[in-house]
């Protein structure tokens, strides 16, 4: 039959997928490309059976009723979109028919499972998985292949994987069903169904990550969501704004995720992985955040929209270090932003005026001080670790400013640096003068032998009172020896002049004693 051909054709593919590196970026694309090559999209069928694909269509559903009702396929039921959470399992689970021979030899093979009667329940329908806690995309990505294989073995015969549309056919064309589900998810976005895309990633929350009872409770009540899955799973408006070109379709898909809680996990309907989803928040702006939240969430008729906003903090609290802590600083709400803009416009008006009434610790000419005064008030609700370093540095620089100075912290910084440089140069000058002080000290000692009147004269000012200094003194230029020689020559000249004057007086018949008494 077809099941045995399927076993031979998918052994290598399953082994390659399971042994693949879980953190590889191309792991999902390679598996998807191989499935696309094997299954043509033109041959379509809605048959579902033991080997049903792991990605559920909106038309294929299993109601959480007794096992006689579970084996009948429900079309367009009221809970058709709520139990699809079972099917977010890796495509490697579809080839677990091979593994079932090793786990339970007495279990019927895939050939007999195709023609099993509708009244027979599966072997282990209510077995709880070992991991029942909610696993974030980071922890899912780092699971070893052995753990995944063990989980898939346990869940291989779950009712979600063994549902069938018409078991009376006693046959299931697996490629046609897979191609049908691929096309339903990729092309039927116009329907009011869950547009879950076929490429599975490591970030998909699998069926073994939550207990079966919780899934049953989710499918019974479509309006209520369990407290650990409602807001933390689906309300991602502050962190995942839709920046892609198909923003309208992505927003509508997000609405389908919120309207049908149990049919999705932490992943969006786009084929991107969790890394791409969570990295969008860093490149997003506040306007796109507010617009996306108001358009996609509030526009949709959701009875639990206030609960989504109320439990937003619970979604971020158990997250590991995958999402950076600086992300919350980027996600300031639009209200503080408007407050900052209004204050900035007021400050611009105040800068244009006289700037008389100002806080002494608030410097408006410095742009950094404005950000230091405003950023802590806007980021108190989110995360101040991103702005703490900047605020400390800025407040340190702004506190060093005096209230009356209008200079920026950079100018004061340079001014404080320039003061020690002036002190250094002044001290150097003093040291050079102290080294050169013995040389000027010799001049008074050498000139003390002379007239010692013109020693302190450093310049010549030609006035009426300077006649005696010019005649009797010596020019201050030259060394001490030159000064001494010139002083000696001046004394000799004065002596000669005095002697010539005395001779002239004697020759004229004057009184020489009376003249000497007047001159001396």
From Swiss-Prot:
Residues 109-118, 155-165, 378-392 have a biased composition (Polar residues). Keywords: Activator, Conidiation, Sporulation, Transcription, Transcription regulation. Transmembrane segments: none annotated. It comes from the Eukaryota. GO terms for biological process: conidium formation; sporulation resulting in formation of a cellular spore. The keyword Transcription regulation applies. Induction: Expression is positively regulated by pcz1. Residues 109-165, 378-454, 468-496 are annotated as: Disordered. Residues 445-454 have a biased composition (Low complexity). Coiled coil: none annotated. InterPro entries: WetA. Residues 420-429 have a biased composition (Basic residues). Belongs to the wetA family. BrlA, abaA and wetA are pivotal regulators of conidiophore development and conidium maturation. They act individually and together to regulate their own expression and that of numerous other sporulation-specific genes. This is Developmental regulatory protein wetA.
């Amino acid at each position: 039959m077809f099941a045995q051909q399927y076993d031979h054709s998918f052994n290598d593919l399953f082994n390659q997928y399971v042994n693949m590196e879980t953190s590889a970026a191309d792991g999902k694309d390679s598996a998807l490309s191989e499935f696309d090559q094997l299954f043509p999209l033109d041959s379509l069928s809605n048959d579902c059976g033991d080997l049903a694909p792991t990605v559920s269509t909106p038309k294929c559903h299993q109601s959480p009723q007794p096992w006689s009702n579970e084996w009948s396929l429900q079309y367009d039921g009221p809970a058709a979109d709520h139990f699809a959470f079972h099917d977010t399992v890796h495509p490697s689970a579809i080839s677990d028919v091979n593994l079932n021979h090793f786990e339970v030899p007495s279990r019927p093979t895939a050939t007999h499972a195709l023609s099993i009667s509708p009244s027979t329940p599966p072997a282990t329908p209510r077995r709880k998985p070992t991991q029942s806690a909610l696993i974030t995309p980071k922890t899912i990505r780092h699971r070893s292949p052995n753990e995944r294989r063990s989980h898939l073995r346990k869940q291989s015969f779950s009712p979600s994987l063994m549902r069938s549309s018409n078991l009376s056919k006693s046959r299931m064309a697996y490629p046609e069903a897979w191609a049908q589900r691929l096309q339903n998810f990729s092309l039927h976005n116009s329907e009011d169904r869950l547009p879950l895309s076929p490429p599975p990633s490591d970030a998909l929350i699998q069926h073994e990550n939550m207990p079966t009872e919780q899934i049953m409770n989710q499918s019974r009540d479509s309006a209520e969501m369990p407290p650990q899955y409602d807001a933390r799973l689906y309300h991602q408006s502050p962190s995942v704004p839709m920046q892609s070109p198909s923003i309208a379709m992505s927003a509508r898909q997000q609405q389908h995720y919120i309207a049908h809680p149990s049919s999705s996990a932490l992943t969006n309907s786009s084929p991107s992985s969790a890394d791409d989803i969570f990295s969008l928040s860093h490149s997003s702006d506040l306007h796109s955040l507010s617009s996306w939240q108001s358009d996609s969430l509030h526009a949709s008729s959701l009875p639990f929209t206030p609960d989504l906003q109320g439990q937003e903090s619970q979604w971020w609290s158990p997250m590991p270090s995958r999402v950076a802590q600086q992300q919350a600083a980027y996600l300031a709400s639009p209200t503080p932003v408007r407050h900052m803009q209004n204050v900035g416009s007021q400050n611009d008006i105040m800068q244009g005026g006289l700037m008389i009434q100002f806080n002494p610790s608030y410097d408006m000419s410095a742009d950094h001080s404005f950000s230091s005064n405003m950023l802590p008030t806007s980021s108190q609700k989110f995360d101040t670790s991103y702005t703490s370093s900047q605020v400390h540095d800025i407040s340190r620089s702004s506190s060093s400013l005096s209230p009356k100075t209008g200079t920026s912290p950079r100018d004061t910084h340079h001014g404080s640096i320039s003061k020690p440089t002036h002190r250094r140069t002044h001290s150097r000058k003093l040291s050079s003068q102290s080294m050169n002080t013995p040389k000027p000290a010799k001049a008074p000692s050498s000139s003390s032998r002379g007239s010692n009147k013109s020693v302190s004269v450093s310049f010549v000012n030609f006035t009426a009172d300077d006649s005696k200094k010019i005649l009797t003194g010596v020019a201050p230029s030259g060394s001490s020896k030159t000064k001494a020689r010139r002083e000696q020559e001046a004394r000799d000249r004065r002596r000669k002049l005095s002697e010539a004057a005395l001779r002239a007086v004697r020759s004229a018949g004057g009184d020489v004693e009376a003249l000497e008494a007047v001159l001396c």
